[in-house]
A protein has these predicted regions:
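Mid-domain alpha/beta scaffold segments of enzyme catalytic cores
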Residues: 2-140, 152, 254
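A short acidic, helix-capping loop that chelates divalent metal ions and anchors anionic groups
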Residues: 36-41, 177-181, 209-212, 244-247
């Protein structure tokens, strides 16, 4: 029997941090409605609906004007739910899909035209990377987004990441357990990637690799600060809402955003993380914040 991911925190708390116009949440997922977009079979777990409308409510509460929807493992390589969200919110949203080698150029163009700018590769799904697919997606202006956990997986994909054509993105700060420290082989691999000038890292999912079960995940701060110090122009923030496959105390998304005040005390650096860096990576119109704000 599959586990069911608990729903996200339902608190209506707003963040203390006042984000600038154009602020972007660069990592979240949309589930359902399953009546229209059923999950694939087989799948690793189940989840309740966390729809586009739910996401838009969260964006308003956090003060976000834009966002990047990331394909979830619950949909496999069926990007229909993602495509629907992008078409309904073309100014506000961009996407990261999950496609396979057999995808046609026509299908890739359809996804690109809708706002897809990257493809997520999951070590857990397949440790073998299709480099030909990465090269092909590069021709469409997409970047590879690498999702892995721990030192051995980081090392296994190191050469592939460094050989990526153009920009590439690393999920969840590289997901290195905090107990291993800043000098671990895994975290040094992430820093080596950042130093290429082509790597971007998502400041997301601190709960997943912290040794602490609840906010503020204080042991993550040195890792986040080191990533920001190394490449302030190539780090972006993501909520990871609705936090799939998480069975410990559910983090509050407003308080996750507030962690940026500690990770990046300088307001100008936070503005890069939240506005300027996402604009450059995902192709939002420069300086354009979505004026069509949604209300609860």
């Amino acid at each position: 029997m599959r586990k069911i991911t608990p729903p996200p925190d339902s608190s209506i708390l707003k963040p203390i941090l006042q984000v600038p116009p154009g602020a972007t949440d660069c990592h979240f997922h949309i589930f359902g409605p399953q009546s229209a977009f059923p999950f694939v079979v087989p799948r690793p777990l189940d989840a309740t609906d966390c729809s586009l409308e739910d996401l838009l409510d969260l964006q308003v509460r956090l003060g976000m004007d834009r966002g990047v929807a990331v394909q979830t493992a619950l949909y496999g390589s069926d990007n229909s739910c993602l495509l629907d969200a992008l078409r309904r919110e073309p100014k506000r949203l961009r996407g990261v899909a999950a496609v396979q080698h057999a995808i046609t150029d026509k299908q890739l163009k359809e996804l690109t035209d809708a706002g897809v700018r990257g493809n997520r590769f999951s070590f857990m799904r397949s440790p073998d990377i299709d480099r030909d697919l990465i090269a092909r997606l590069h021709e469409f202006g997409w970047h590879p987004q690498y999702w892995f956990e721990g030192e051995q997986q980081a090392l296994a994909w190191k050469d592939t990441m460094l050989d990526s054509p153009g920009n590439f993105v690393i999920d969840h700060m590289g997901w290195q357990p905090c107990g291993l420290g800043l000098n671990s082989i895994g975290f040094r691999t992430i820093l080596e990637c950042l130093e290429t000038g082509r790597c971007w890292v998502k400041l997301s999912g601190p709960n997943r690799f912290s040794m602490e079960d609840v906010l503020p995940y204080s042991d993550v701060a040195p890792f986040a600060q080191k990533l920001i110090e190394t490449a302030p122009d190539r780090v972006i923030w993501g909520s990871d809402w609705p936090h799939p496959n998480w069975f410990k105390p559910m983090p509050n998304d407003a308080r996750l955003l507030d962690l940026l005040m500690d990770w990046a005390p300088d307001e100008s650096v936070r503005n890069k993380i939240l506005v300027e860096n996402p604009e450059g990576l995902f192709g939002f119109n420069l300086g354009e914040a979505n004026g069509d704000h949604h209300t609860n």
